[in-house]
Amino acid sequence: MRRLVKLGALASLPLVAFAGCYGNEATAFPQGLEPWEENVAPMPEPTADDPCPEVIVFSENRTFTGMRPDGRGYEANSLHARACIHQPMDVVWEAIRDPQVGKDHTSVNSFTVIDPPMPDECDGDYQTQINAGTAPFTVDFRLCWRQQVAEGLEDAPLLTATRWQKVWGSSALPVLEGSLVSRPLEDHPEITVVEYQYHLNALTSSHQTIRDYLTVIYGRVRDRAHGRPLP
């Protein structure tokens, strides 16, 4: 069983579930697992027979300015995204916790799960070590993944929070960090909303790089939740 991040002080962040339909409300997240900003991506457009289709929808291109623990500032390309999965929260939460859903099988050369994580690098649930790129310009890096139920119970979650970030690797990749929040769709507990934020500053990257990665990992979470094999 993978460890959960210990619950510390709670951070509140106003989140909007559906722009134009609902107001802001403060949501408490475990310290360090909260999203950086209010998610501004639109929801998937409902249809006559589907309140939230299984597609991912992105915000406009953004730039994020953050602060490192040592006080140094940084900038990174940023995108927000929202999508739905036609499975209840407990099923989607189980899928999210599978380390293999974080693998971009379209771009990595190798992907290794480190569980338990290296304690001097990661205080989370597990790490992934990745080699990506095309030879001879490949990069190696490790990500730390932290996940927790923010509201509800482990086997009956109402809100979950996941954060991942680069903790070791190539200096050609100064910033790589992401956030995933999951919650039930309003009035449709059989459908789960997933909300992403992703920051990337790399030598050869763009907002399209982020768009491609989030499309892949959303698809892997969705397929895992539906019991489909992952490539």
Where are the language model's segments positioned?
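Glycine-rich portal/gate segments that line the openings of hydrophobic small-molecule binding cavities
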Residues: 70-77, 84, 100-173, 186-202, ...
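Active-site cradle of extracellular carbohydrate-active enzymes
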Residues: 179
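Hydrophobic ligand-binding cavity/cleft-lining segments
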Residues: 22-123
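Bacterial N-terminal signal peptides that target proteins for export
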Residues: 1-11
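C-terminal motif of bacterial Sec signal peptides marking the signal peptidase cleavage site
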Residues: 18-20
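Extracytoplasmic/secreted proteins, especially bacterial periplasmic and envelope-associated proteins
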Residues: 87, 91-95, 209-216, 220
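Mobile, glycine-rich extracellular loop/lid and propeptide segments
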Residues: 176
